Structures are given as structure tokens and as C-alpha cells.
């Protein structure tokens, strides 16, 4: 009797251990499918990709991740925080993928795996409307300019002004909205950001802002970064497949036209970024 009881207890314990091990053996995609939720981290000061419209999170990223969610059979849970905390938040496991998006660079590719690109990310300058002192990018020499902290756009702006004969003073802002506010107030003469972003801002406020042509930055693309490890491989594979389907059936172009007024020709993947 005691022997049979001991044997049953041993089998039960083994079952519990096996079940627990099985739960831990699930990779990121399996856990997300089991929970039914994909957690996506982003900021809300990067229009038209992410911004707050009448108290609601809106933008290209919201629309595109809605389509990704349909393909994966899950719902999206947005985790909103300042941009400088987004990539550290990904690595800390606060969410499953960044819905920023971020400029694809060689340095970032060493650390993260990027999805197919969603738009061009070449950097240009935004100035005050009617400011004739800045008619080309080189005109910011010796002046005060600004950009968003911890961004690839800010890095390109700093590199560009270093090439000018009269070095510009580059101010770093917590977000692009703060930089745009200082530009409108005349505290700086230009803001460096990706062309899609500043074109959207200038379109929304044509009496206040104007894009300086041509862009000064290196040709680059925006994509969503995720973790580059075995646990997240199947998740990133699934998101990549979903995004390529969304691109090929025309949904991406429709979303781009909604937010940019035009569609971008982008490669399926950026394997060798210029930056």
C-alpha cells in the first residue's frame, strides 16, 4: 500500500516538473500566442508614426501593428515611454518588440534584429516658415539647432554640423515636440529629423514650419527592432512574414499614403545599412 502511494506521488511530482519545464521551454512566440497579446513599446512624440491625437494614441505604427496583429491572431498592448527608454525597455523584457520605429544602422544591427522597413529615414532640416537665413542645410553653420535625444537623427545632425566651417550649437531635447516648440519660438533655427516626420509636421502647420531641401543625411530606412536571440527568433520570423505579406498585398502602401501623402519604395530587408 505504502509502496503504491509512494509510486503515485513520484509520478505526480515528475508530471509537475515536466509541465513546469514545458512552460519554461516555450519561446517568445509561443508565450505570446498563449496569452493572446503582443506587447509593443514606443514613444508618442514622433508624428506621423506615433503621436497623441485628442487623447488617443494614433499614427502609422498603430495602423500597421493592427494589421500585424490580425496576421498573428493576437491583440496589441502598447507600452508608452520616452524614446531614450524604449530600447533599454526592450532588453529589460518590458515588451516584446519596439514599435518606434528606429533607423537601421550597422551598430544597432549588431544588437537587434530588424523587421522589414516601413519608410525611408533620410535626415533633413525643419525651419521656421519664411526664414530666409536658412535656405540650404549648410546655412545652419554657426547657429543653434536641435534634435531628439538618443536618436540616430541627432547623431547624423551632429556629424553634419561638424563638417561645416562655423560649427553649430546642437541642443538635445527629450522629444521632438519640445524641439519643434523651441523652433517655433525662435530659440533655435532648425530641427534635424527624418524627412517623413518633418514633412508631416510642415504639412500640419504650414504657417509655422518649412522643410529645408535637400536632405543632408545618408540614405536610411526605418524598421522595428526586436531582440536578436534564440528565444525571440520565431517571433521575429512571424512578424517578418506578416509584414512582407502586408507589403506585398498593398496594405503598407495604403497606410503610408494615409500618413505621408505618398508611398515609399523600401527593400524587403536592410542587410547592409549605409549608416
Predicted regions and their residues:
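Short helix-initiation/N-cap motifs at beta->coil->alpha
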Residues: 77-88, 132-133, 170-185, 220
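Periplasmic-binding protein-like
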Residues: 44, 120-127, 203-240, 262-275
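A ligand-binding cleft/hinge motif common to bilobed small-molecule-binding domains
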Residues: 85, 102-110, 156-161, 184, ...
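Ligand-binding clefts/hinges and TM-proximal coupling segments of bilobed small-molecule sensing domains
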Residues: 27, 152-170, 210-211, 243-275
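Extended ligand-binding regions for polar small-molecule ligands
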Residues: 62-71, 131, 143-144, 150-151, ...
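Acidic, polar ligand-binding/catalytic clefts
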Residues: 70, 75-139, 215-216
Amino acid at each position: 500500500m505504502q509502496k503504491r502511494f509512494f509510486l503515485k506521488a513520484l509520478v505526480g511530482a515528475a508530471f509537475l516538473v515536466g509541465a513546469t519545464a514545458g512552460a519554461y521551454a516555450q519561446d517568445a512566440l509561443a508565450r505570446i500566442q498563449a496569452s493572446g497579446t503582443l506587447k509593443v513599446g514606443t514613444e508618442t512624440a514622433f508624428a506621423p508614426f506615433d503621436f497623441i491625437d485628442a487623447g488617443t494614441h494614433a499614427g502609422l505604427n498603430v495602423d500597421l501593428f493592427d494589421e500585424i496583429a490580425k496576421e498573428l491572431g493576437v491583440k496589441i498592448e502598447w507600452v508608452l515611454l520616452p524614446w531614450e527608454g524604449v530600447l533599454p525597455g526592450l532588453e529589460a523584457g518590458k515588451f516584446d518588440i519596439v514599435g518606434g520605429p528606429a533607423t537601421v544602422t550597422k551598430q544597432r544591427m549588431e544588437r537587434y534584429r530588424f523587421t522589414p522597413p516601413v519608410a525611408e529615414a533620410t535626415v533633413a532640416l525643419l525651419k521656421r516658415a519664411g526664414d530666409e537665413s536658412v535656405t540650404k542645410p549648410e546655412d545652419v553653420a554657426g547657429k543653434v539647432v536641435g534634435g531628439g535625444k538618443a536618436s540616430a537623427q541627432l547623431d547624423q545632425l551632429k556629424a553634419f554640423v561638424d563638417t561645416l566651417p562655423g560649427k553649430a550649437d546642437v541642443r538635445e531635447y527629450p522629444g521632438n515636440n519640445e524641439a519643434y516648440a523651441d523652433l517655433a519660438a525662435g530659440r533655435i533655427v532648425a530641427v534635424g529629423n527624418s524627412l517623413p516626420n518633418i514633412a508631416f509636421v510642415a504639412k500640419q502647420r504650414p504657417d509655422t514650419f518649412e522643410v529645408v531641401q535637400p536632405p543632408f543625411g545618408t540614405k536610411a530606412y526605418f524598421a522595428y527592432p526586436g531582440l536578436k536571440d534564440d528565444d525571440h527568433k520565431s517571433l521575429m520570423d512571424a512578424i517578418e512574414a506578416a509584414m512582407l505579406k502586408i507589403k506585398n498585398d498593398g496594405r503598407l502602401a495604403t497606410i503610408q499614403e494615409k500618413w505621408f501623402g505618398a508611398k515609399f519604395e523600401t527593400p524587403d530587408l536592410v542587410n547592409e545599412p549605409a549608416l
